[in-house]
Amino acid sequence: YSAMAAALCSLKGPRHGGANLMVMQMMQNIRENLHDTEDDEELEAYLKKLLHGEAFDRKGLIYGMGHAVYSLSDPREVVFKGYVEQLAHEKGRDKDLALYNKIEHMAPQLIAEERKIFKGVSPNVDFYSGFVYDMLGIPMELYTPLFAVARIAGWSAHRIEELLSANKIIRPAYKSLGGTHEYIRRNERE
């Protein structure tokens, strides 16, 4: 139980667990600062301001874009988006969906140009999950707990696996080919 509690407590902040909150806050900021969310030129200019750290939280990020592993597309987002579109139509949120779609199409190109990232950037599952929670009437304070609840089954499975393996030490199934390097003190690093 302590490990589960620690895992839940580690889900604080926008990096892991709070990213959909940041997307929602960013989208609200975009709506508040654009005269017309359907104006592509105005939206593109604002997205550039985000990337230059001149708008919203000044971090230089378009939240919900990019993933550490998935570059061409996040398979979770690809599947999820169909449900997002269906729910948006049912809830009468087509205008909001249109804004998300515009950002989904504009952001990767702008990020590639501004950041010189050419490996590919695509929306991740957090880009739409907060929008879905909002359409379902779920308060923002519950977004991160929902993120955690979805993982508890996996965490529990890992724990059961550990109990069944008689506490054997798990070792990586690969050998590093990187070689060794002399340690350089932190204050001496470039």
For each feature predicted by the language model, list its residue ranges.
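Non-transmembrane, aqueous-exposed alpha-helical and coiled segments at domain scale
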Residues: 1-190
